[in-house]
From Swiss-Prot:
Residues 1-36 are annotated as: N-terminal extension. Its cofactor is [3Fe-4S] cluster; [4Fe-4S] cluster; Zn(2+). It comes from Acidianus infernus. Zn(2+) binds at H16, H19, H34. Ferredoxins are iron-sulfur proteins that transfer electrons in a wide variety of metabolic reactions. [3Fe-4S] cluster binds at C45. The modification N6-methyllysine is found at K29. One of its GO terms (molecular function) is 4 iron, 4 sulfur cluster binding. The keyword Thylakoid does not apply. Keywords: 3Fe-4S, 4Fe-4S, Electron transport, Iron, Iron-sulfur, Metal-binding, Methylation, Repeat, Transport, Zinc. Residues 37-49 are annotated as: Ferredoxin. Gene3D superfamilies: 3.30.70.20. It comes from the Archaea. This is Zinc-containing ferredoxin.
């Protein structure tokens, strides 16, 4: 799952459509964690609902 401390343990590396992106990011394979209040780890998410 997502590291519950990602906001302090990871660095903000950019923004995407108005929300923060926490790194590391190295597209196309490593996409980081998107969001601050509700976050999605794009490296763990398989978009199944």
């Amino acid at each position: 799952g997502i590291d519950p401390n990602y906001r302090t343990s990871r660095q903000v590396v950019g923004e995407h459509q108005g929300h923060k992106v926490y790194g590391p990011v190295d597209p196309p394979k490593v996409l980081g964690i998107h969001g601050t209040i509700v976050x999605v780890d794009f490296d763990l998410c398989i978009a199944d609902g």
